[in-house]
Amino acid sequence: MSKLLKLVIVGDGGVGKSALTIQLTQNQFIAEYDPTIENSYRKQVNIDEEVYMLDILDTAGQEEYSAMRDQYIRSGRGFLIVYSIISRASFEAVTTFREQILRVKDLSTYPIVIIGNKADLPDKDRKVPPMEGKELAKSFGAPFLETSAKSRVNVEEAFFTLVREIKRWNQNPQNEEMLPPKKRGCIIL
């Protein structure tokens, strides 16, 4: 039996969130940019000899949909925060996405992985060197990977790393204490 994990992929518009998700779940690259409002994908995977059903929420990067973010952040068990290596602005937005996740979760730490996408593009187009991504992720205590949805570089590894982060986070008893108590209740209509 597989364990269900809700993963949320966030980042500015146009960084390749949908391309990464579709490459993982459907093994294809979508080149055209069609702004996402919200899509959900599922994929069963075997990670470290355990079977997981990944429920991946691909979110809108555009600012006009930012009001929806709190809602999907609440439900996420882990987050891929994606920027494009050819967009300095998308890299600078990573901190804002992380802060929003921690604010909504009301925690000081949570399972995230920082992703620099579009690593297949020529170095002359690059606006964010790999070391900057690594340093930012390190300052968050988060793993960092550069990916390419187009050439399928580190696509699986990005999602698998997030699952391992969730597993590691869940095994730390201090993190259990930080979570709000599970709500139980009854509704009488």
From Swiss-Prot:
Membrane-related topology note: Lipid-anchor
Lipidation (S-geranylgeranyl cysteine): C186
GO annotation (BP), single: regulation of adenylate cyclase-activating G protein-coupled receptor signaling pathway
Cellular compartment(s): Cell membrane
Binding site for GTP: 11-18, 58-62, 117-120
Modulation of this protein's activity: Alternates between an inactive form bound to GDP and an active form bound to GTP. Activated by a guanine nucleotide-exchange factor (GEF) and inactivated by a GTPase-activating protein (GAP).
Family annotation (CDD domains): H_N_K_Ras_like (cd04138)
Pfam families, per the entry: Ras (PF00071)
Cysteine methyl ester modification, residue list: C186
Major site of localization recorded for this protein: membrane
Propeptide: 187-189
Protein family membership: Belongs to the small GTPase superfamily. Ras family.
Protein name: Ras-like protein rasC
